[in-house]
């Protein structure tokens, strides 16, 4: 049996930026002294004249990006999720979103899988913060293929986009001929009749594995990849809820305000069904190996399986 290919989506982000740079002269990449970690150093090497290191000054970087967008450039401002959504929130809101500027934010190292860097760098609140900003698209890819497609789609979208990428290498799950990416459109990865599992990011692969464990117990789970949290694919979410009668959301984010919040808001108005939110339960993360943290917070396949089985 061949080993499953694993790639960190931050590496996919860096590779995708190079392809964008080759195709579009107006792409500019900005960094805040983290080009190696965000994997945008590859773009810097290929297009040094279109890479700007703003230093450890994330607020200035976002303001700089807004200025570039106002002159017709398409800037990709890159830093850790904690700094992109947290430290620079005011600039994202007032300098980018309020004037509706065409700035793309590449936020790497999101969630607890950042690992040993600990709670100060494990941003589990970024979806909630960015979802609340008017006009902001919020997305998180499940693998290498989806991450690259997302970067291209973000370029094509006119307006601000927040994309979260991960540090941890994750399985490639979208390597199939019929794969199609579109912002705001979810993807059904597994059909099922007993309940629906809705996930994004690295939790998609774990949810698929959990679904197989559930199947062995006679529980048939539908699995949907909702890579775009805003705008949410409400049509797909509502249809799945009506079809299966129960919904579980899984995300490497607080259960407050992220994918789980978006799904609950939608279903409360359009298709009320029982919902279980799996994620970070109103606590901070801690330092440790990524795999150990995912297990501790119930976000590995076994943890998801146990929580879903208890819910059903």
What are these regions (language model features)?
Residues 1-164, 169, ...:
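Thiamine diphosphate
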């Amino acid at each position: 049996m061949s080993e499953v290919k694993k790639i960190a989506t931050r590496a996919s982000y860096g590779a995708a930026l190079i392809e964008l740079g080759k195709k579009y002269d107006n792409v500019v990449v900005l960094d805040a002294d983290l080009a190696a970690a965000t994997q945008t150093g590859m773009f810097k090497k290929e297009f040094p004249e279109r890479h700007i290191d703003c230093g450890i000054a994330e607020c200035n970087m976002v303001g700089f990006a807004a200025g570039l967008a106002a002159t017709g450039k398409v800037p990709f401002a890159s830093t850790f999720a904690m700094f992109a959504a947290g430290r620079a929130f005011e600039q994202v809101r007032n300098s980018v979103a309020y004037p509706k500027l065409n700035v793309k934010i590449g936020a790497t190292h999101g969630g607890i899988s950042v690992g040993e860097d600990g709670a100060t760098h494990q941003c589990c609140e970024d979806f909630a913060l960015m979802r609340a900003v008017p006009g902001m698209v919020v997305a998180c890819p499940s693998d290498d293929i989806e991450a690259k497609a997302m970067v291209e789609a973000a370029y094509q979208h006119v307006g601000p986009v927040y994309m979260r990428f991960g540090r941890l290498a994750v399985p490639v799950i979208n390597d199939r001929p019929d794969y199609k990416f579109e912002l705001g459109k979810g993807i059904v990865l597994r059909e099922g009749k007993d309940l629906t599992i809705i996930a994004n990011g690295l939790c998609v692969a774990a949810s698929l594995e959990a679904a197989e464990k559930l199947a062995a117990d006679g529980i048939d789970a539908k699995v949907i990849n909702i890579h775009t949290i805003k705008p949410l694919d409400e049509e797909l979410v509502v249809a799945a809820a009506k079809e299966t009668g129960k919904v579980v959301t899984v995300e490497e984010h607080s259960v407050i305000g992220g994918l789980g919040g978006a799904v609950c808001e939608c279903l409360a108005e359009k298709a009320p069904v029982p919902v279980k939110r799996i994620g970070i339960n109103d606590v901070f993360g801690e330092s440790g190996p990524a795999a150990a943290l995912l297990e501790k917070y119930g976000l590995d396949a076994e943890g998801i399986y146990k929580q879903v089985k208890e819910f059903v």
